């Protein structure tokens, strides 16, 4: 019956939430470190694709990322990466077309992660590294990090575009682009599900080799 279906869903969700609340701190640290490494690696791969020499520096950051990114390799990598992509005058946070386009694309990605994580029964507010009590989507903000490069690729070279409805549609369409994950091609929207489930599996026992990495 419909009532028993609702009850089962609620029961499943409470079971998932219990699992989430029981994740060990050392497992969360290991998984967050793996996510940071993957993010920097994707940035490195994009710069390498563009033949930017800075990709070598990012490679050293991947290798040098410590547990919980104690030495802030993520922050250092972001500076090098955005300078290489958009020039030394580019600053994240400035009110420019590029920043507006990046933010719009990132929001689309984050929404897809929110849907996936909530659909699996996890609480999006209980993050690994993002822990703001005012952010309902801390966990999504953690998991989305390596996927941001997909937006960066879509926005790169579009400096002369206008923020038209067509351009917004172009950015929305990133969820329908194909990427490779688990040795098969999937649209980004489906790849997010495969990746998110693999992260949650890794959080159960701290085995970060379970995390599935996508390729462009």
What are the roles of these predicted feature ranges?
Residues 2-7:
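Short, small-residue-biased leader/transition segments that mark boundaries at the very start
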Residues 9-25:
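A charged helix-plus-loop insertion that forms the helical arch/lid used to bind
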Residues 23-97:
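Internal, conserved structured core segments that host functional sites
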Residues 92-95, 118-132, 157:
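Short acidic alpha-helical/loop segments enriched in Asp/Glu that coordinate divalent cations
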Residues 101-126:
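Conserved mixed alpha/beta catalytic, RNA-binding, or beta-rich assembly cores of soluble enzyme
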Residues 141-160:
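A structural-propensity feature for long, helix-poor, extended segments
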């Amino acid at each position: 019956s419909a009532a028993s279906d609702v009850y089962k869903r609620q029961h499943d969700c409470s079971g998932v939430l219990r699992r989430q609340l029981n994740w060990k701190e050392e497992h969360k640290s290991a998984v967050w470190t793996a996510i940071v490494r993957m993010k920097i690696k994707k940035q490195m791969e994009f710069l390498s694709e563009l033949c930017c020499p800075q990709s070598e520096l990012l490679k050293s950051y991947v290798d040098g990322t410590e547990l919980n990114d104690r030495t802030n390799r993520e922050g250092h990598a972001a500076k090098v990466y955005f300078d290489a992509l958009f020039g030394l005058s580019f600053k994240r946070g400035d009110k420019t077309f590029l920043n507006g386009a990046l933010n719009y694309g990132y929001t689309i990605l984050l929404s897809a992660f929110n849907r996936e994580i909530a659909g699996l029964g996890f609480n999006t507010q209980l993050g690994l590294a993002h822990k703001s009590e005012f952010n309902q989507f801390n966990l999504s903000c953690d998991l989305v990090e390596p996927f941001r490069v997909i937006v960066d690729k879509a926005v790169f070279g579009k400096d002369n575009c206008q923020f038209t409805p067509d351009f917004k549609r172009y950015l929305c369409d990133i969820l329908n682009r194909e990427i490779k994950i688990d040795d098969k091609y999937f649209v980004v929207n489906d790849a997010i599900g495969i990746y998110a489930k693999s992260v949650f599996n890794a959080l159960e026992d701290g085995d970060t080799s379970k995390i599935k990495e996508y390729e462009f």
